Amino acid sequence: MFANSRLIYGTMGLGGGWNSDKLTPKAVEEAALAFEAALEIGIDYFDFADIYQNGKSESVFGEVLKANPEFKNIIKIQTKAGIILANKDGIGQFDFSAKHIINAAIDSLSRLNVSSIDSLLLHRPDPLMEASELKEAFKYLFENGLIKKMGVSNMNQYQIQYIEKATGFKVKSNQLQISLSKLDWLDGTIGVNNDNGYRSTFTPGLLEYMMLH
Protein backbone atom coordinates (compact mmCIF):
# COMPACT_ATOMS: atom_id res chain seq x y z
CA MET A 1 0.00 0.00 0.00
CA PHE A 2 2.77 2.42 0.87
CA ALA A 3 5.25 1.50 -1.85
CA ASN A 4 6.73 4.58 -3.48
CA SER A 5 3.95 5.93 -5.66
CA ARG A 6 4.54 7.28 -9.16
CA LEU A 7 1.75 9.75 -8.46
CA ILE A 8 2.12 12.85 -6.30
CA TYR A 9 -0.75 14.55 -4.50
CA GLY A 10 -0.77 18.31 -5.14
CA THR A 11 -1.84 20.33 -2.12
CA MET A 12 -2.32 23.77 -3.68
CA GLY A 13 -6.05 23.68 -2.92
CA LEU A 14 -5.71 22.85 0.78
CA GLY A 15 -5.52 25.36 3.61
CA GLY A 16 -8.63 27.49 3.40
CA GLY A 17 -7.78 30.24 0.91
CA TRP A 18 -5.13 32.51 -0.55
CA ASN A 19 -5.32 35.02 2.28
CA SER A 20 -3.83 35.79 5.68
CA ASP A 21 -6.70 34.23 7.64
CA LYS A 22 -5.81 31.68 10.30
CA LEU A 23 -6.36 27.98 9.80
CA THR A 24 -9.85 26.82 10.66
CA PRO A 25 -10.93 23.44 12.07
CA LYS A 26 -12.81 22.89 8.80
CA ALA A 27 -9.63 23.38 6.74
CA VAL A 28 -7.76 20.92 8.95
CA GLU A 29 -10.58 18.38 8.66
CA GLU A 30 -10.65 18.70 4.86
CA ALA A 31 -6.88 18.24 4.69
CA ALA A 32 -7.06 15.17 6.91
CA LEU A 33 -9.71 13.61 4.68
CA ALA A 34 -7.66 14.36 1.55
CA PHE A 35 -4.53 12.96 3.18
CA GLU A 36 -6.27 9.75 4.21
CA ALA A 37 -7.90 9.33 0.78
CA ALA A 38 -4.52 9.65 -0.93
CA LEU A 39 -2.94 7.07 1.35
CA GLU A 40 -5.84 4.67 0.83
CA ILE A 41 -5.13 4.52 -2.91
CA GLY A 42 -1.38 4.24 -2.46
CA ILE A 43 -0.26 7.84 -2.96
CA ASP A 44 2.41 8.58 -0.37
CA TYR A 45 4.15 11.56 -2.00
CA PHE A 46 2.82 15.06 -1.33
CA ASP A 47 3.69 18.26 -3.20
CA PHE A 48 3.69 21.69 -1.57
CA ALA A 49 5.08 25.19 -2.09
CA ASP A 50 5.77 27.84 0.50
CA ILE A 51 3.37 30.18 -1.31
CA TYR A 52 0.40 27.81 -1.65
CA GLN A 53 -2.55 29.35 0.19
CA ASN A 54 -0.03 31.82 1.68
CA GLY A 55 1.75 29.01 3.49
CA LYS A 56 -1.41 27.41 4.84
CA SER A 57 -1.17 24.34 2.60
CA GLU A 58 1.97 23.41 4.50
CA SER A 59 0.56 24.48 7.86
CA VAL A 60 -2.64 22.47 7.53
CA PHE A 61 -0.64 19.39 6.57
CA GLY A 62 1.57 19.97 9.60
CA GLU A 63 -1.52 19.89 11.79
CA VAL A 64 -2.53 16.56 10.25
CA LEU A 65 0.94 15.15 10.97
CA LYS A 66 0.75 16.36 14.57
CA ALA A 67 -2.36 14.23 14.98
CA ASN A 68 -0.82 11.31 13.06
CA PRO A 69 2.95 11.34 13.79
CA GLU A 70 3.27 7.70 12.71
CA PHE A 71 2.83 8.79 9.09
CA LYS A 72 6.11 10.72 9.07
CA ASN A 73 8.07 7.55 8.34
CA ILE A 74 5.70 6.50 5.55
CA ILE A 75 5.21 9.59 3.41
CA LYS A 76 7.52 11.74 1.30
CA ILE A 77 7.32 15.51 1.08
CA GLN A 78 8.23 17.81 -1.78
CA THR A 79 7.99 21.57 -1.47
CA LYS A 80 9.12 24.59 -3.44
CA ALA A 81 10.72 27.97 -2.72
CA GLY A 82 11.84 31.05 -4.61
CA ILE A 83 8.64 32.98 -5.39
CA ILE A 84 7.53 36.02 -3.42
CA LEU A 85 3.81 36.66 -3.84
CA ALA A 86 2.59 40.00 -5.13
CA ASN A 87 2.28 42.79 -2.57
CA LYS A 88 -0.62 45.23 -2.25
CA ASP A 89 0.65 47.04 -5.35
CA GLY A 90 0.52 43.84 -7.37
CA ILE A 91 4.30 43.44 -7.52
CA GLY A 92 5.69 39.94 -7.08
CA GLN A 93 9.18 38.64 -7.66
CA PHE A 94 11.57 35.72 -7.61
CA ASP A 95 14.28 35.44 -4.97
CA PHE A 96 16.90 32.70 -5.31
CA SER A 97 19.30 34.36 -2.88
CA ALA A 98 20.91 32.06 -0.33
CA LYS A 99 19.23 33.88 2.54
CA HIS A 100 15.76 33.55 1.05
CA ILE A 101 16.05 29.90 -0.01
CA ILE A 102 17.51 28.82 3.33
CA ASN A 103 14.93 30.73 5.36
CA ALA A 104 12.10 29.51 3.13
CA ALA A 105 13.16 25.89 3.66
CA ILE A 106 13.42 26.36 7.42
CA ASP A 107 9.99 28.01 7.53
CA SER A 108 8.52 25.15 5.47
CA LEU A 109 9.98 22.59 7.87
CA SER A 110 8.33 24.41 10.75
CA ARG A 111 4.93 24.64 9.05
CA LEU A 112 5.05 21.01 7.91
CA ASN A 113 6.13 19.80 11.35
CA VAL A 114 8.99 17.68 9.95
CA SER A 115 12.77 17.70 10.39
CA SER A 116 13.73 17.14 6.75
CA ILE A 117 12.27 17.76 3.30
CA ASP A 118 12.58 14.87 0.85
CA SER A 119 12.83 17.17 -2.16
CA LEU A 120 13.17 20.96 -2.34
CA LEU A 121 12.41 22.53 -5.72
CA LEU A 122 13.39 25.95 -7.00
CA HIS A 123 9.99 27.35 -7.96
CA ARG A 124 10.18 28.41 -11.64
CA PRO A 125 13.21 30.11 -13.22
CA ASP A 126 14.70 33.24 -11.68
CA PRO A 127 16.55 35.15 -14.43
CA LEU A 128 18.65 36.88 -11.76
CA MET A 129 19.83 33.69 -10.02
CA GLU A 130 23.53 33.73 -9.13
CA ALA A 131 25.81 30.71 -8.89
CA SER A 132 27.40 31.72 -5.58
CA GLU A 133 24.02 32.23 -3.91
CA LEU A 134 22.68 28.88 -5.11
CA LYS A 135 25.83 27.08 -4.00
CA GLU A 136 25.70 28.63 -0.53
CA ALA A 137 22.01 27.80 -0.09
CA PHE A 138 22.11 24.15 -1.10
CA LYS A 139 25.44 23.46 0.57
CA TYR A 140 23.91 24.62 3.85
CA LEU A 141 20.65 22.73 3.37
CA PHE A 142 22.32 19.43 2.46
CA GLU A 143 25.09 19.62 5.06
CA ASN A 144 22.57 20.29 7.83
CA GLY A 145 20.26 17.48 6.72
CA LEU A 146 17.36 19.83 6.03
CA ILE A 147 16.75 18.43 2.53
CA LYS A 148 17.47 15.10 0.84
CA LYS A 149 17.12 16.03 -2.85
CA MET A 150 17.20 19.13 -5.03
CA GLY A 151 14.82 19.78 -7.89
CA VAL A 152 13.41 22.54 -10.08
CA SER A 153 10.09 23.65 -11.48
CA ASN A 154 9.37 24.52 -15.12
CA MET A 155 12.98 24.90 -16.23
CA ASN A 156 14.75 24.00 -19.45
CA GLN A 157 17.93 22.01 -19.91
CA TYR A 158 20.28 25.00 -19.82
CA GLN A 159 18.79 26.33 -16.60
CA ILE A 160 19.15 22.88 -15.05
CA GLN A 161 22.76 22.60 -16.23
CA TYR A 162 23.52 26.02 -14.79
CA ILE A 163 22.05 25.12 -11.39
CA GLU A 164 23.88 21.78 -11.27
CA LYS A 165 27.20 23.41 -12.10
CA ALA A 166 26.57 26.24 -9.64
CA THR A 167 25.67 24.00 -6.72
CA GLY A 168 27.63 20.83 -7.41
CA PHE A 169 24.45 18.83 -6.77
CA LYS A 170 22.30 16.86 -9.20
CA VAL A 171 18.83 18.11 -10.07
CA LYS A 172 16.65 15.07 -9.39
CA SER A 173 13.32 16.33 -10.70
CA ASN A 174 11.72 18.98 -12.90
CA GLN A 175 8.06 19.68 -12.18
CA LEU A 176 6.37 20.92 -15.35
CA GLN A 177 3.07 22.72 -15.85
CA ILE A 178 1.43 20.68 -18.60
CA SER A 179 -1.95 21.04 -20.25
CA LEU A 180 -3.49 21.34 -23.72
CA SER A 181 -3.06 25.10 -23.45
CA LYS A 182 0.41 24.99 -21.87
CA LEU A 183 2.82 23.41 -24.34
CA ASP A 184 5.88 25.65 -24.22
CA TRP A 185 7.69 22.90 -22.32
CA LEU A 186 7.34 20.77 -25.46
CA ASP A 187 8.23 23.30 -28.14
CA GLY A 188 9.62 26.70 -27.27
CA THR A 189 10.72 27.65 -30.77
CA ILE A 190 7.92 26.90 -33.24
CA GLY A 191 4.55 28.58 -32.67
CA VAL A 192 2.51 26.25 -34.86
CA ASN A 193 -1.16 27.31 -35.13
CA ASN A 194 -0.55 30.00 -32.53
CA ASP A 195 -2.25 33.27 -33.43
CA ASN A 196 0.17 35.19 -31.26
CA GLY A 197 3.20 33.35 -32.60
CA TYR A 198 6.66 33.57 -31.15
CA ARG A 199 8.12 37.02 -31.68
CA SER A 200 11.58 36.16 -30.35
CA THR A 201 14.20 34.18 -32.24
CA PHE A 202 16.12 33.49 -29.02
CA THR A 203 16.01 29.92 -27.75
CA PRO A 204 14.71 29.63 -24.17
CA GLY A 205 17.66 29.14 -21.85
CA LEU A 206 20.06 31.23 -23.93
CA LEU A 207 20.91 33.41 -20.93
CA GLU A 208 21.86 30.41 -18.78
CA TYR A 209 23.83 28.85 -21.64
CA MET A 210 25.88 32.04 -22.00
CA MET A 211 26.45 32.19 -18.24
CA LEU A 212 27.77 28.61 -18.32
CA HIS A 213 30.17 29.35 -21.15
Spans of features found by a protein language model:
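Active-site groove signature of glycoside hydrolases
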Residues: 109-130
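A short acidic, helix-capping loop that chelates divalent metal ions and anchors anionic groups
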Residues: 15-21, 84-91, 184-185
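N-terminal binding-site loop/beta-alpha segment at the start of enzyme catalytic domains
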Residues: 1-76, 143
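Beta/alpha (TIM)-barrel catalytic core signal, keyed to glycine-rich beta->alpha loops juxtaposed to Asp/Glu
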Residues: 125, 129-213
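Conserved, mostly hydrophobic/aromatic
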Residues: 9, 38, 46, 61, ...
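Short, acidic/polar
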Residues: 23-38, 94-113, 133-136, 157-162, ...
